[in-house]
Amino acid sequence: MMRTHYCGALNRNNIGQDVTLSGWVHRRRDLGGLIFIDMRDRDGIVQVCFDPKYQDALTAAAGLRNEFCIQIKGEVIARPENQINKNMATGEVEVLAKELRIYNASDVLPLDFNQNNTEEQRLKYRYLDLRRPEMAQRLKTRAKITSFVRRFMDDNGFLDIETPMLTKATPEGARDYLVPSRVHKGKFYALPQSPQLFKQLLMMSGFDRYYQIVKCFRDEDLRADRQPEFTQIDVETSFLTAPEVREIMERMVHDLWLDTIGVDLGKFPVMTWQEAMRRFGSDKPDLRNPLEMVDVADIVKDVEFKVFNEPANNPNGRVAVIRVPNGAEITRKQIDEYTQFVGIYGAKGLAWAKVNDINAGLEGVQSPIAKFLNEEVWKALAERVNAQTGDILFFGADKWQTTTDAMGALRLKLGCDLGLTRLDEWQPLWVIDFPMFERDEEGNLAAMHHPFTSPKDFSPEQLEADPTSAVANAYDMVINGYEVGGGSVRIFDPKMQQTVFRILGIDEEQQREKFGFLLDALKFGTPPHAGLAFGLDRLTMLLTGTENIRDVIAFPKTTAAACLMTEAPSFVNPQALEELAISVVKAE
């Protein structure tokens, strides 16, 4: 037998037992007559002692080095009282080695487990990076999460049904990864960005509660929390309203947090998209941050200051204030840095006012814009934002979107810089009632979620007449500023679906070409249905306390969508391309 116990599982209850362990040398210490090693496996670390009492094992241990793969047979004994290590789960015991077997020696590692290695090194030698206890723990947590989700879904009547990986390219927002067909030359499959249409078709097939833990693919620009291939917990239901879907999914996430890290998330508040954008400048607000935006356009619309009065009198403008309690200590240099920061989001500047004495009116205000205000305006501003002595007010004034984006980003930065964001808290919420459509860079209407989301209380005729007023029956789950899941009630009326396609500029010929199968299916007694998808990678990232999604994926890609370990993507044999009727055009 190669193993009777895992290293990290040993404790006082095992004292006196003979055990067989298999794993790696984590650290070695030679004390002359005795040799100690920390032995590691996926479950943890235990100290092993080589004693002259078992001379053969001691002699063999002299040749051990870090990362040798070994087997130990020995007895679990109690550590002397003065050698107990309370920082180790196994710190009360050690294993007295009777036999040592070396499965494999190890070359000197290209990584140093005791130092910070570069991201490039870690990804190139990922199989070594995953030996680190913190990395192993993250993947164990991920496995625990998926196991919990499957149990929850099974207990609530959901069926685990697989959907195709090779499918048809359909416009879902990002670029598709295309797969050429050898049999149908000149034609391509697409790897799914999500199982969206297939799970809707499953509802039409009568499977009223579906789920799947599934790989999805998007060829898009990457960030720290994005990967070209990622894993979704995909869910769809029939005959449930949006609040009913949210209740089930909230219960799952609530219980997942309790099961995984012992945290009770409580009841999730519900907030409309409009409120989230107005107060926090984001559709995924981090409620751990106490700072909020307050609209003041009505107060400053008549001041002799074009920076304020022009957006204040523009229906598409916005003037908003963030009050920072006790922020008057912020230096001019810091203010200049914040001014540069909001410029990233298109803001032309950042007005500010320090409240040195709230009872002194404008005399108690230190600000380059004080000369444009009068006592009445200042009093109204101070009351609106509840200004106090020692505060600083930051003003954003521009187009609605620019002000909202810039001040929302500033809010987050101020919360971090000033230690206002309560990092030890969990703050979940639902964001609902998103706009049905938004304008793209060319000014055309685009679906804010996807083109299969149903509007709220709109007929097809009303939607076509006034699409920009429509509210989507959509919902996102947000935790600590991260969107962890999003979904909607789906369109189940063929007339409504065709109307949405037309609004998005998809004519009837394109509708038949791209979505003919869906439009046909909608004609045959389609049930009302709604669903949601969670990002498993992002959930795991939050539950393990890391800020990089690559830390919770066994073999992730870089931000350039490359695998440094296998050197994918790579060139392929010209003969393979010829069989696919593909010729590669070299970039100039």
Curated annotation (Swiss-Prot):
Keywords: Aminoacyl-tRNA synthetase, ATP-binding, Cytoplasm, Ligase, Nucleotide-binding, Protein biosynthesis. SUPFAM superfamilies: Class II aaRS and biotin synthetases, GAD domain-like, Nucleic acid-binding proteins. It is found in: Cytoplasm. L-aspartate binds at residues 172, 218, 449, 490. Its main location: cytoplasm. GO terms for molecular function: aspartate-tRNA ligase activity; ATP binding; nucleic acid binding. The keyword Aminoacyl-tRNA synthetase applies. GO terms for cellular component: cytoplasm. Its EC number is 6.1.1.12. It catalyses: tRNA(Asp) + L-aspartate + ATP = L-aspartyl-tRNA(Asp) + AMP + diphosphate. One of its GO terms (biological process) is aspartyl-tRNA aminoacylation. ATP binds at residues 218-220, 227, 483, 535-538. Pfam families: GAD, tRNA-synt_2, tRNA_anti-codon. Residues 196-199 are annotated as: Aspartate. InterPro entries: Aa-tRNA-synt_II, aa-tRNA-synth_II, aa-tRNA-synth_II/BPL/LPL, Asp-tRNA-ligase_1, Asp-tRNA-ligase_1_N, Asp/Asn-tRNA-synth_IIb, AspRS_core, GAD-like_sf. Catalyzes the attachment of L-aspartate to tRNA(Asp) in a two-step reaction: L-aspartate is first activated by ATP to form Asp-AMP and then transferred to the acceptor end of tRNA(Asp). Belongs to the class-II aminoacyl-tRNA synthetase family. Type 1 subfamily. Homodimer. HAMAP family: Asp_tRNA_synth_type1. This is Aspartate--tRNA ligase. It comes from Haemophilus influenzae (strain 86-028NP). The lineage of its organism: Bacteria, Pseudomonadati, Pseudomonadota, Gammaproteobacteria, Pasteurellales.
